[in-house]
Every structure is written in C-alpha cells, then in structure tokens.
C-alpha cells in the first residue's frame, strides 16, 4: 500500500518500483489524502498502463481527506485482500524487481513450493506473521548511499525494538489477517508504526 498526499514529485518512483515487480500477484493500494497537485494524474496514468500490461497488477486508488498518515494506513488495512501488506509510501522504493518474489518465496518456505495458499484462514496460519529485511538509504536518483544505521535482527521479537525501529515499515511485510486486528493508533503523530510493529 502507498499512502500519499500532494506527492507528485515522489509518487512516480514508488509507482515504477511496484510496476516493475516480477511477482504476478500484486495488489497495489494507493491511499491519497485528497491531493491538490498532480499526484492523482500520475496514479491514473499508472492505472491506464497497468490495464494493458502483460501481467497486470491490481491497482486501486482511494482519494479522500484523512486525519493523517496513520488514518490513511488504517484505510489500506481495511481494503487489503492479499496475504501480506507492506507500506511503501510515496518516495519509497523496493530494492529490486525481484523483491516481492523473494518475499513470497521466504513466506512459503514451509510449503516446499513458491505458491501462496488460497486465502483460507487455516492455510494462512502456516505462513509467518512477518517477513522482513534490511533497508538501504538512497539519494533522489535512487543510488545507494548507505545501509540504514539500525540493522534488522536475525530473529525479530518485540525486544528487538527496545533501541528503536530496528525494521523500517518499508521492509516489514505483515500478514494481512493479523495486521488488520492491530490498527495504527492515530493518537500518535509520529510513532504509530513503531507501536504497531511491536504489537
């Protein structure tokens, strides 16, 4: 899911990153806070390109006023239908065009194949609650600058967050059925993602 507001200068990078993914089962939710710039125009062009793509992704856009980023992220949680949800907001990008395929492979390792199960609660329980990775810092052109200061631990527990947000939400793939039970606390202006990841 991509949350944005007046993000015309940033949204193309994110759209292109998702559009390039080689994983065929992508649901891209774009939750826009009623942008007044060219953000929605870029999203509509994306939807048009996607409609004629060889392997189209499902692209849905909701544009309406919200009460901040975490309210918008909660809207995405309610709309999501996939097995996992990732918040890749305007300006964020995935590491490579294989990122989502690699995540699906990691999530389904217990199955011995690379196909996610049908959306059946009994099958979903076999999938890991979270799949996560490292985060790189890049410049405006997308060139690598450095690895993020806090590195993701080998095993993720709530204790790993004692020293800060060890896994960025941009690298935190949460199982949708579980994530939906723990909405973002909109009372927090800046740290609701930290609180959400711990829960």
Regions found by a protein language model. Name each.
Residues 1-199:
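Nucleotide-sugar donor-binding/catalytic module of glycosyltransferases
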